[in-house]
């Protein structure tokens, strides 16, 4: 018996969570990632590296959310960001245990070698983000650690071939 209709029905009932993710690149062409370590939520025991970013607020565009997240997570003010360079759609579990369909847009933002300013972090971010790190392209290409999105090197090669080469 084929139960594919059950999967389709379940996906049709799932909330779509729109979010903007930022590939933040410094003057040395390193990419900033945060390490998320979950201890007291539905993702307890999971640890991974991920980009700056987060969900859209009511009425926001992906671009507006990208600028807001850049300010909230790094203290960097931008009035706009360039067009997104990648789109991702996938199922994911949130720390609340809700399973959603994630609809992400990835943007590239260049900043000076500024330190991460955590003054605007939410309480949740303070709990789950254990550290930040600037990664070289080669480090990202060769790491065995869990990194989301897992295709950052390919996105960089496709978007900025004059800087990032395989």
What do these predicted ranges mean?
Residues 28, 37, 87-89, 113:
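Short, flexible active-site-adjacent loop segments at beta-strand->alpha-helix junctions, enriched
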Residues 39, 91-95, 154-156:
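A generic membrane alpha-helix/interface feature
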Residues 142-166:
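Charged phosphate-binding loop/patch that engages nucleotide di/tri-phosphates or the phosphate backbone
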Residues 53:
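A short acidic, glycine-rich active-site loop
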Residues 2-50:
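N-terminal strand-loop-strand
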Residues 56-80, 89-147:
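Unchanged
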Residues 29-30, 41, 114-116, 139-142, ...:
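Generic "edge-of-domain/loop-turn" microfeature
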């Amino acid at each position: 018996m084929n139960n594919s209709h059950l999967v389709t029905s379940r996906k049709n009932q799932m909330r779509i969570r729109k979010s903007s993710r930022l590939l933040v690149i410094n003057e040395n062409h390193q990419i900033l990632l945060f390490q998320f370590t979950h201890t007291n939520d539905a993702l307890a025991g999971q640890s991974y590296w991920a980009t700056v970013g987060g969900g859209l607020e009511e009425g926001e565009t992906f671009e507006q959310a990208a600028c807001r997240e850049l300010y909230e997570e790094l203290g960097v003010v931008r009035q706009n960001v360039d067009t997104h360079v990648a789109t991702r759609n996938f199922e994911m579990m949130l720390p609340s245990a809700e399973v959603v369909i994630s609809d992400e847009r990835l943007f590239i933002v260049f900043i000076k070698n500024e330190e991460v300013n955590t003054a605007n972090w939410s309480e949740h971010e303070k709990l789950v983000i254990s550290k930040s790190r600037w990664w070289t392209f080669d480090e990202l290409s060769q790491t065995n650690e869990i990194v989301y999105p897992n295709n950052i090197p390919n996105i960089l090669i496709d978007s900025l071939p004059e800087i990032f080469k395989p």
